[in-house]
Amino acid sequence: MFYLAFALNFLMGFVLLKILAIYVPQDILGKYFFLSNSGLFVGGLLLLGFPLTFQRFIPLYFRDGKEEKAHALIHLPSVIHFILGLLISVPILIFKGLDAFILFLAFYIVNTVSLYQTALISLVKIFEYSITSFARLLTIVCLLLISAPLLTLRTIGIINLAVNFAFLLILFSMFPLALKPWKEVFTEIREYWIYSLFTQILSPFFYFIDSLLIPLYLPYSELSLFQIARKLDMGARQTLEVPLQLTAPIISFKKTDELLSKEFAEKYRAFRLFYFYLTLFWFLIFEFFGKNIVLLVSTSQYLEAYPHLVLLSFTLLISTLYATDTTLARSTGNIKLFFYKDLVWVVSFILTLLVLTPKLGLFGVTLSFGAATIVTATFHLYNFPVLHPFEYLLEALKILVIGIQAMTFMTSGRFFFSILLIASIIAIDFKQIKMTLRVLKNYIAASQNP
């Protein structure tokens, strides 16, 4: 049910994007992305690590019969988060006007909604989570379709604010209100909450900082163009997060001697290869069919998003050098390295964007993603090398070859040359691919017969 809801929400997100691209002018759509992502960014920062804390402590409290503590943990951070959103929105209303206020608050509330949805997941109420998350998006899409000829920033904002607030009230009512045990709860969660805070505090920068910085140098129409590519790229990134999230608890349960064993090393290399080819699959989809996909989720005026989509997905391919290593570091308690890796990416991205965008325009933004990813890979591999340096070198060479074939295809359209290079990489990895398939087969068999 969870994965069905994920797929449906994934689909509805692109239906929503299509509606906006058809009925909203490009510059107005850019303003929409700026204001909505501003709300998501600020709301995401003020989550303050509580989603991860919920996932840890809510199941424990219910297991031990301490439901009142669980409800206090759910409600107080969520209510405070909502109140902070109202307070922050007041200056926006005064200085930026009603449209900006409505859109900012509408998308800020999405983060408050996510706190209650995290509580549902923590209680394994997958059906309730799936229904509320899908119904919220479906309602927004239906109302936007009904209002399509009259869509403005204000109508889009009113629809989102009304629906999000309604579902916030629905989710609020699902949990009995209890605030008294909060002091005792905070004492118990404090240490883990600090860990969660450092784990999640930089996440909004990855998702939204580009939307906030682009308007400093470029018109809103350029932001809307870039966001089409970014939304597609983020869709791929979200699907690639799933195997990492599924693997993290498996690693966490292993003892030190197990992590150092030959068997674990074999399985880890198999997982790295699986993750690499899963990422390569998305990259090739965007490279060969990217123009059609852009048309599918938007209109012909956004076709210029195609090269940005390919470049963004290529940075995702570069990140395979350290993505699984990062999961290993986080799962074994190396939170400082995890935090500093994120910090390096954010700082290097902002600096390169501020330097490149005035000179290269929108391509400066896209190249900033690549530069930040390369700097982060260098930092991570220097501080937390898991494999032999020669293995990382081979992986980097594969990525370089893939980049060369992509440039050749995009400039000349020579499809056969691209297929030849990809086939050569698969041939080189063929022995490792067979091992990966064997490990995967054994894992599936073990999970079916515990």
Language-model regions: role of each:
Residues 1-9, 35, 40, 44-101, ...:
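Membrane-water interface segments that mark the loop-to-transmembrane alpha-helix transition
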Residues 5, 9-13, 17, 33-43, ...:
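Short runs within selected transmembrane alpha-helices of multi-pass transporters and secretion channels
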Residues 17-43, 188-192, 196, 214-234, ...:
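Interfacial/gating helices of multi-pass transporter permease domains
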Residues 18, 47-64, 229, 233-272, ...:
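Helix-loop junctions and terminal segments of transmembrane helices
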Residues 24-35, 63-76, 85-108, 150-157, ...:
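Membrane-interface helix-capping segments at transmembrane helix termini in multi-pass transporters
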Residues 52, 75-102, 145-146, 169, ...:
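Alpha-helical transmembrane segments of multi-pass membrane transport and lipid-handling proteins
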Residues 127, 131, 153-155, 160, ...:
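Interhelical loop/hinge segments that connect adjacent transmembrane helices in multipass membrane
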Residues 390, 409-450:
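Membrane-proximal transmembrane or re-entrant/amphipathic helices at the cytosolic face
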